[in-house]
């Protein structure tokens, strides 16, 4: 009966019912300014020249200083031969050098390629070659590896920089006199120790503790030192002539579905995305906020909602290269951020930290969660313990990335990814052809259209044709829309489990198991079943010091799920595989399960 009533609804996607949820300050039709990212930086420099733009481990860069650094490095890149349309690869964590390199490249009309520092050489080789990158900026910790890898790519110049380049004098001294480790994986866990370096005291001990944070770079042709370059080049304030359709970056997909693809995002995409986001948060004032820069900038979520949004609004960005829970809590206490975009894992880890109840998080005006679904129970628990409000949203690399958000000052439906942001159209279509609209309330594939939607995939016309159809971006996500225009992500299309002829969405199972008081993380997959075709298996990480049995979890599910959704297997693990931004890799668990069964 309920389904019949849903089918008979008169609301259609063309009606755009979500617009009724817009606050009075959100226009139903946006009038976009014809400005681009370099213009936004220049505007913030003019309006807030002496305001802190970036803070890294206590080192402060004002907007005026940031522009000077950008102009100097732009002059350097120009001397390397970089011009409009050329690709520059950035292989850095969240550092001052990362922000400067990005804006210097796009100021020249170059195309940025943001690479993940934790990727293995074959992954980086693919991205360097696919993008045609000519110059690479990286840490000294990775430089020797990249010098060796360069022979397999078209990269001509490498710029090496150090974590010590922008730190208060005492910290810089320790790093520059430390040991010579060359593995990026070695240095990441040690980053929180930087804050514990004494100005006076046992420097020898500090050197030993921090010897993993710097490295010698071997001599090689066309390998340059960052600080020397900035000192030797005068600022070049020239700007390339930019258009909406010019590509600003090749943002490679996370590889959760196979070989990463280079998403071509344009200057128009990124500019309009920032304008869409800005109008959504009316209480966040230009030049007056502090953003927690914990999301990695090599991921488009962090790049847009932290790095570029902060520059657009003239805010202070607290750079966090390694966002561990204790470090996040310390930064929130010391720097009092007002805007904190995070991913679910960061919320969960802070929530499980023993100091969470002692932490004062009242400075936060808005929390934004994206990249992966945030379990409803986690939202409730985090808000109860912190007093902060979490706004959940949705997006993907191909949409710059945000398409949906819960209203900041309107009705917030917990569990929903919200409503389409201004100038964004959405439909739910059938899974078979992708051409027919599903009745409102019934699941189908979410497709979106808007100024933030990518130009296409680099060197992949076949994939572009499948994903972009008549301007509509086919997300691969199964979703529903309610009568008010709020959207709910049911699951990934490729993750759906078919059990006994019924569609089972793993997120439904995950949500229930997250409600169990002993469970910290959960991820469901489909496994072969002799009679049903597929059945549900769940991988679980328990909270610290908790114990549970398979029967206990299954019995918990039996009182909360339809019989065809009941798990038949539970596997407890110490940790689950994740991307570098904390998204649980369901495909990896599925592959591990297939391999295990194949090997008997």
Describe each PLM feature range.
Residues 31-33, 38, 42, 50-83, ...:
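Conserved AMP-binding/adenylate-forming core of the ANL superfamily
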Residues 77-83, 232-246, 250-293, 313-315, ...:
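Conserved adenylate-forming
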Residues 87, 93-113, 117-121, 129-135, ...:
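A short helix-loop-beta submotif of the ANL/AMP-binding
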Residues 136, 450, 455-456, 463-466, ...:
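AMP-binding/adenylate-forming catalytic core of the ANL superfamily
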Residues 177, 337-342, 351-412, 425, ...:
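Gly/Ser/Thr-rich phosphate-binding loop
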Residues 185-252, 259, 284-290:
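Conserved pre-ATP/AMP-binding loop-to-beta segment of ANL
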Residues 271-290, 298-339, 353:
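Conserved AMP-binding/adenylation subdomain of ANL enzymes
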Residues 419-423, 434-467, 504:
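Conserved ATP/PPi-binding loop(s) of AMP-dependent carboxylate-activating enzymes
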């Amino acid at each position: 009966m309920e389904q019949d009533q849903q089918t008979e609804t008169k609301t259609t996607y063309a009606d755009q019912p979500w617009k009724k949820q817009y606050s009075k300050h959100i226009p139903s039709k946006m009038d976009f300014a014809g400005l681009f990212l370099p213009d936004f930086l220049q505007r913030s420099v003019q309006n807030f020249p002496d305001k802190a733009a970036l803070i890294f481990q206590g080192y402060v860069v004002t907007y005026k200083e940031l522009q000077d650094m950008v102009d100097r490095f732009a002059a350097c890149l120009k001397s390397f031969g970089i011009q409009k349309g050329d690709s520059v690869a950035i292989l850095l964590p969240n550092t001052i050098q990362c922000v400067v390199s990005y804006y210097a490249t796009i100021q020249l009309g170059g195309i940025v390629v943001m690479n993940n520092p934790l990727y293995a050489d074959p992954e980086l080789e693919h991205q360097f070659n696919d993008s045609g990158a000519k110059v690479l900026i990286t840490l000294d910790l990775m430089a020797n590896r990249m010098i060796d890898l360069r022979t397999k790519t078209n990269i001509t110049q490498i710029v090496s920089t150090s974590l010590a380049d922008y730190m208060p004098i005492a910290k810089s001294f320790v790093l520059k006199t430390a040991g010579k480790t060359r593995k990026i994986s070695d240095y990441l866990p040690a980053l929180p120790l930087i804050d514990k370096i004494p100005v006076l005291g046992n420097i020898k001990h500090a050197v030993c503790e921090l010897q993993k944070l710097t490295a010698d770079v071997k001599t090689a042709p066309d390998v340059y030192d960052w600080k020397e370059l900035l000192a030797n080049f005068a600022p070049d304030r020239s700007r390339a002539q930019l258009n909406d359709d010019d590509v600003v970056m090749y943002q490679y997909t996370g590889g959760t579905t196979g070989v990463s693809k280079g998403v071509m995002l344009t200057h128009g995409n990124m500019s309009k995305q920032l304008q869409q986001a800005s109008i959504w948060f009316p209480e966040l004032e230009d030049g007056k906020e502090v953003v927690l820069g914990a999301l990695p900038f090599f991921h488009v979520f962090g790049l847009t909602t932290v790095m570029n949004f902060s520059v657009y609004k003239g805010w202070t960005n607290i750079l966090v290269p390694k966002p561990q829970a204790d470090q996040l809590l310390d930064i929130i206490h010391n720097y009092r951020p007002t805007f904190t975009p995070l991913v679910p894992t960061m919320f969960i880890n802070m929530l499980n930290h023993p100091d969470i109840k002692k932490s004062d998080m009242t400075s936060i005006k808005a929390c934004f969660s994206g990249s992966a679904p945030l379990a409803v129970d986690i939202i409730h628990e985090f808000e109860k313990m912190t007093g902060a409000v979490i706004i959940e949203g949705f997006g993907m690399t191909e949409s710059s990335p945000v398409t949906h958000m819960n209203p900041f000052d309107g009705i917030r439906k917990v569990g929903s990814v919200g409503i389409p942001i201004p100038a964004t159209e959405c439909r739910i279509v059938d899974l078979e052809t992708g051409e027919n609209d599903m009745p409102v309330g019934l699941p189908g594939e979410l497709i979106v259209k808007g100024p933030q939607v990518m130009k296409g995939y680099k060197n992949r016309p076949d994939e572009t044709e499948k994903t972009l159809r008549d301007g509509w971006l086919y997300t691969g996500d199964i979703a529903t829309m309610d009568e008010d225009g709020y959207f709910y992500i049911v699951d990934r299309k490729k993750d759906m489990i078919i059990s006994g002829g019924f569609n089972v969405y793993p997120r439904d199972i995950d949500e229930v198991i997250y409600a169990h008081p002993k469970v910290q993380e959960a991820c469901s997959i489909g496994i072969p079943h002799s009679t049903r075709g597929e059945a549900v298996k769940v991988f679980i990480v328990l909270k610290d010091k908790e114990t549970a049995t398979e029967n206990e979890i299954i019995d918990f599910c039996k009182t909360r799920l339809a019989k065809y959704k009941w798990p038949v297997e539970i596997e407890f693990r110490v940790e689950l595989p994740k991307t570098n931004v904390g998204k649980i890799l369901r495909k990896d668990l599925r592959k591990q399960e297939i391999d295990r069964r194949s090997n008997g």
